[in-house]
Design a protein with these regions (language model features):
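Non-transmembrane, aqueous-exposed alpha-helical and coiled segments at domain scale
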Residues: 3-170
Length: 170
């Protein structure tokens, strides 16, 4: 029942506006590609948003503190053209690997990534979960397992009709 659920909305990758810590920020062509494909520019100022791979450590912490029971993943289609998709599953701090969100994230966090195969498929025309490529399903399953939270809805484009409900078990 929707009234018994707390939905968390996330992107298939991470963005940040303004300064501050962003462990998975990409300063290379990959970051630029995500920014361009995701139209990650400020609506008023046109300022570039900072882009990076999904940070599952930070997301898991956010899910916990907000009591999220189900997730909605937006902008899945932005990752359609990548050979490899990365997801931060831990951080290295002073040479030690940790899988929790530390008290002080101001500096010294190095992301530890899991790499998954990209789906290299245009998902924008898909209308049901049955059409999703195997690699995309593997990415979603990986995220669900890492986050211990089901992803119930995914978007495969900016239009309302490009929002697909998944038939996951609760």
């Amino acid at each position: 029942c929707i009234r018994d659920s707390v939905y968390g909305i996330m992107k298939a990758y991470c963005t940040r506006v303004g300064s501050g810590p962003f462990p998975t920020e990409l300063f290379d062509e990959t970051g630029k590609k995500i920014r361009d494909l995701g139209h990650e520019y400020g609506a008023v100022t046109g300022r570039e948003r900072r882009c990076g791979w999904i940070d599952l450590v930070a997301l898991k912490y956010s899910i916990m503190v907000n009591g999220v029971t189900q997730l909605i993943m937006m902008k899945s289609d932005v990752l359609d053209d990548f050979e490899t998709i990365k997801a931060c599953v831990a951080y290295k701090v002073n040479g030690e690997e940790i899988d929790y969100f530390p008290y002080d994230i101001s500096e010294g966090l190095e992301p530890v990534y899991a790499e998954l195969p990209g789906w290299k498929t245009d998902m924008t025309k898909m209308t049901s979960e049955d059409e999703f490529p195997e690699e995309f399903n593997a990415y979603v399953t990986f995220l669900e397992e890492q986050l211990e939270t089901p992803i119930k809805i995914v978007s495969v484009g900016p239009d309302r009709g490009q929002t697909i409900e998944r038939y996951t078990e609760e």
